[in-house]
């Protein structure tokens, strides 16, 4: 409810006729726009028609066993067969889990990839950056592709420290694939935008070739062109959301028959 601001929506409206009647630029320009906003190398990032398009392309490229933490966002496991999935279900009432839990469970499961939604959807469980580094080291040593969906990371405390969209980090862990929806925290699900990043440039190139030539429409492209100007508004909106989340959490705790699970999503 706090983003995008009225000024941003008015800017999009004022360009409606032009955006409606012109073709979008295509993947090269869209990747450049995303790389500038997220400060990630253009060779490391691609843009999708929502994260769902990128998830589909990514899952189709992966073979072998994939580790999945349940409950989860079903778009990922829906792209694989049941035989391909090694499921981990937390054995507690709060659906919480740690890096140690994941490593202990998946260590000898002969995975080719591991999916982590962080913060988790739908449980809201969150593994902080300093702990996540151990999972990155483990997956690198095991030669397991680690897919981290951080679509809700901007809702976390110290969110700028928690994102994995960093050139140095991506370069150090070529097995890491980061997926981020530009819908949830940005408040624009109708535009259908998402990004996928990895220093595995062969993977990025393959996905870019897999999606359609104009997978992002002109309105979504224009949004990426201008949203850097509204960065302060966006950060302020996220802070307002976190305050409201805390208020709502406290109100729910006052209801005697509810067991309220903490969330960073």
Predicted regions and their residues:
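N-terminal small-domain helix-loop-helix segment of the aminotransferase-like
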Residues: 1-50
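Conserved beta-loop-alpha segment that forms the PLP phosphate-binding cup at the N-terminus of a helix
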Residues: 28, 42-66, 194
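Short glycine-rich anion-binding loops that position phosphate/pyrophosphate groups of nucleotides
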Residues: 1, 51, 73, 118-122, ...
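Short beta-strands and strand-loop turn motifs
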Residues: 86-89, 113-120, 146-150, 261-263
């Amino acid at each position: 409810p706090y983003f995008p601001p009225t000024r941003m929506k008015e800017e999009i409206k004022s360009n409606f006729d032009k955006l409606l009647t012109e073709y979008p630029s295509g993947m090269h320009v869209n990747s450049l726009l995303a790389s500038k906003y997220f400060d990630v190398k253009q060779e490391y990032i691609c843009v999708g028609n929502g994260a769902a398009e990128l998830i589909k392309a990514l899952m189709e490229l992966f073979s072998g066993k994939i580790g999945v933490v349940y409950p989860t966002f079903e778009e990922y496991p829906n792209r694989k067969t049941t035989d391909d999935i090694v499921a981990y279900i937390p054995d507690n009432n709060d659906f919480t889990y740690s890096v140690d839990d994941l490593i202990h469970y998946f260590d000898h499961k002969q995975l080719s990839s591991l999916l982590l939604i962080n913060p988790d959807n739908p449980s809201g469980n969150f593994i902080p950056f300093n702990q996540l580094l151990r999972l990155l080291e483990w997956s690198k040593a095991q030669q397991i592709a680690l897919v981290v969906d951080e679509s809700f990371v901007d809702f976390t405390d110290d969110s700028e420290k928690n994102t994995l969209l960093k050139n140095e980090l991506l370069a150090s862990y070529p097995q890491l694939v980061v997926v981020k929806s530009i819908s949830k925290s940005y408040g624009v699900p109708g535009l259908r935008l998402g990004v996928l990043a990895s220093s595995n440039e062969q993977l990025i190139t393959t996905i870019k070739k897999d999606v359609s030539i104009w997978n992002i429409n002109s309105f979504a492209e224009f949004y990426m062109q201008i949203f850097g100007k509204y960065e302060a508004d966006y950060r302020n909106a996220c802070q307002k959301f976190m305050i409201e989340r805390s208020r709502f959490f406290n109100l729910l705790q006052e209801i005697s028959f509810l067991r309220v699970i903490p969330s960073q999503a």
